């Protein structure tokens, strides 16, 4: 064994210790996973002569990366809470069927997405805001990245089922394999072999294959509940599970898909109001956001299986305690990071680029974009609780509200109607954080807490 397979007992022991035990390996995993997304950009930005232009071009591929991740999470993050609830109810056979259904849907959708992407890569990039100059770098990167769609989606979509069984350290290791490989392979392919932007994509695909191989090995050979493809005679029974998986996963799917839509809208408006340089600025802001959000995501994912398992086991006191601990951890962390962003933005920006003109334009944009980021925590906490407790309608509604009905309209309204230019694009985010995040969190408190009290009264 590479690692000792220590499991977390979601039903017993300290809730705080359980969340830390689940969240810390996930934090390491997510930090490493972040390398998949930002290491390419760091190295690409330092390619002699073309770094800034190539960075903006690769940033145009970000919506596609988000779409692929969104589909993986639709089936993975949609299935894992149902899997955990079934385990909490001691229905292991049902839990396995849910996992197998998720796995089959992950693989099928990956093949479909890869084929669509390869066929329509150029028009998609133009839709995302690519100019003819940007296509020179964005098109080859996207074509190579698409080849790794299947391993990428397996690694992302099935890792939650490792964590949901209490093997959070194994989940961390599965991400570490690919992330470390990517960190080592990127400079080799980009600079040593001289492949440039293409080299970054090749390194990423190889790394994704390594992660996916480990995830499949563990879930088919070592886990307590093992995964496989659905058999033909199981397809009809799986339709009900598939519907529930998609229903629950739709909230996170919408949240990620609308991230992609917002990115497309921002790039299109910025290309008109600020030119290609502001596409690069937005790429840096997106990278900083990923850097900041990674621990938040880890804390949410660390708390989610504990919420789901104890909700299924009808242990409302532990559900309530998990909500409080998870919320406190996230809010404290974000307060620290928000202070760094507001008072020392240049430090974070220079991680991705040392171009003086790019840094100069990025500093005010970063401050505007993150002005009310702490309110975004309220959205994350509310969404995680709704998803973990199988509250599909609430999760879906609040995913749509902030991005589709607040951010996107403001991204057009503030630059064009209020004549705020590029600042309007970046300020749309904090306005949506305050409105959307506040409404989501208050609704969560008003719906979930009374239900937990009723559960206590019944028991």
Predicted regions and their residues:
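Alpha-helical transmembrane segments and their lipid-water interface positions
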Residues: 29, 33, 37-44, 69-76, ...
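N-terminal transmembrane alpha-helices
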Residues: 10-50, 63-78, 82, 107-114, ...
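Small-residue hotspots at the loop-to-helix junctions and early N-terminal turns
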Residues: 52-63, 138, 142, 201, ...
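Transmembrane helical elements of multi-pass membrane transporters/channels
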Residues: 21-40, 144, 178, 207-211, ...
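Helix-terminus/linker motif at the lipid-water interface of multi-pass membrane proteins
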Residues: 31, 35-56, 125-132, 188-195, ...
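Short runs within selected transmembrane alpha-helices of multi-pass transporters and secretion channels
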Residues: 76, 145-163, 171-182, 200-215, ...
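Short alpha-helical transmembrane segments in multi-pass integral membrane proteins
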Residues: 1-23, 83-148, 192-249, 307-372, ...
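Small-residue-rich hydrophobic transmembrane alpha-helices
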Residues: 55-115, 152-171, 267, 279-339, ...
């Amino acid at each position: 064994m590479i690692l000792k397979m220590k499991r977390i007992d979601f039903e017993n022991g300290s809730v705080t210790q359980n969340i830390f035990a689940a969240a810390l390996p996930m934090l390491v995993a997510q930090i490493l996973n972040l390398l998949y997304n930002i290491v390419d950009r760091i190295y690409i930005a330092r390619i002699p002569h073309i770094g800034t232009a190539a960075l903006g071009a690769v940033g145009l591929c970000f919506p596609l990366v988000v779409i692929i991740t969104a589909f993986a999470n639709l089936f993975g993050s949609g299935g894992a809470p149902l899997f955990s609830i079934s385990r909490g109810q001691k229905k292991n056979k049902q839990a396995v069927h849910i996992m197998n259904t998720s796995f089959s849907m992950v693989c099928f959708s990956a093949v479909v997405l890869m084929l669509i992407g390869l066929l329509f890569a150029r028009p998609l990039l133009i839709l995302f805001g690519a100019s003819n100059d940007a296509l020179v770098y964005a098109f080859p990167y996207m074509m190579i990245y698409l080849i790794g769609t299947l391993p990428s989606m397996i690694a992302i979509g099935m890792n939650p089922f490792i964590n949901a069984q209490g093997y959070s350290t194994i989940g961390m290791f599965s991400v570490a394999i690919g992330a470390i490989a990517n960190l080592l392979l990127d400079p080799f392919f980009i600079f040593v072999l001289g492949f440039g932007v293409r080299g970054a994509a090749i390194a990423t695909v190889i790394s994704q294959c390594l992660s996916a191989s480990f995830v499949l090995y563990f879930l088919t050979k070592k886990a307590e509940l093992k995964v496989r493809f659905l058999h033909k005679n199981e397809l009809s029974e799986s339709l009900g599970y598939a519907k529930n998986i998609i229903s629950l996963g739709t909230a996170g799917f919408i949240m990620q898909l609308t991230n992609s839509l917002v990115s497309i809208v921002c790039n299109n408006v910025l290309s008109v109001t600020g030119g290609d340089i502001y596409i690069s600025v937005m790429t840096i802001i997106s990278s900083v956001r990923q850097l900041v959000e990674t621990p938040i995501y880890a804390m949410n994912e660390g708390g989610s299986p504990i919420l789901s398992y104890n909700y299924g086991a009808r242990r409302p006191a532990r559900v309530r305690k998990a909500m409080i601990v998870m919320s406190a951890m996230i809010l404290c962390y974000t307060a620290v990071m928000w202070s760094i962003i507001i008072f020392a933005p240049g430090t974070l920006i220079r991680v991705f680029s040392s171009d003086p003109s790019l840094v100069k334009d990025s500093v005010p944009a970063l401050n505007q974009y993150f002005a009310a980021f702490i309110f975004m925590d309220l959205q994350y906490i509310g969404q995680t609780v709704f998803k973990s407790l199988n509250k599909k309608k609430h999760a879906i509604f609040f995913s749509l509200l902030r991005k589709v009905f607040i951010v996107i309209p403001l991204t057009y309204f503030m630059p064009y109607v209020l004549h705020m230019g590029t600042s309007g694009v970046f300020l749309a985010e904090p306005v949506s954080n305050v409105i959307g995040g506040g409404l989501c969190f208050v609704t969560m408190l008003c719906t979930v807490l009374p239900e937990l009290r009723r559960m206590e009264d019944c028991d």
